Amino acid sequence: DLHSFPTRRSSDLVVAGAVELGVRELSVYAFSTENWRRSPAEVRFLMGFTRTVLRAQTDDLLEWGVRVNWVGRTPRLWKSVLSEVRRSERITAGNETMVLNMCLNYGGRAEIADAARAIAGEVAAGRLKASAITEATIRRHLYSPTMRDVDLLIRTGGEQRTSNFLIWEAAYAELYFSALPWPEFDRVQLWRAVEAYAGRERRFGGAVDAVDGQLPDRKSVV
């Protein structure tokens, strides 16, 4: 399925389109923890592609005011890829226009399991009481505690599932499914997705009156 893998052009267009739309935070599922089950050739392609795109795109991200934030696990991640991600984070650290969350070697269940493990360790060490654990406690132990809750989750390629992506952060996300493969999803398609999202009524589990006037004023798209 190499033909369905991303291209640098598609990545550039979507990031640029998000900046133009005023999106404050964009999360990209670059490589999942489940992707290690792919063939060695596919893994090499995805790792190499991510490294190449980061190296080539960092200057553009700096110019656009985009700050890179890596989200994921360290084990098994190629050292050269991790080095490139850290480099992009350092170079773009002062940018404030938009945050680009690079979800690399990431899995939603893995994130929650890692958070639970860290919390259990604090309880065992006597630094935290089990009765004091709240949703805020869990959030503080996620890979990127300051990440915004997701407003809009876009899935390309004709699949209608979220594939273990940002399970905690996307609890109340609006879903948008596109039949187009990722390489063909550009800024125009992004605009259409955001336009569809803008026409929806979000309730966050409550009645309309309960959330009237309390909708988020900043967008987070994945």
Show the residue positions of the predicted features.
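Flexible, compositionally biased loop and terminal segments
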Residues: 4-222
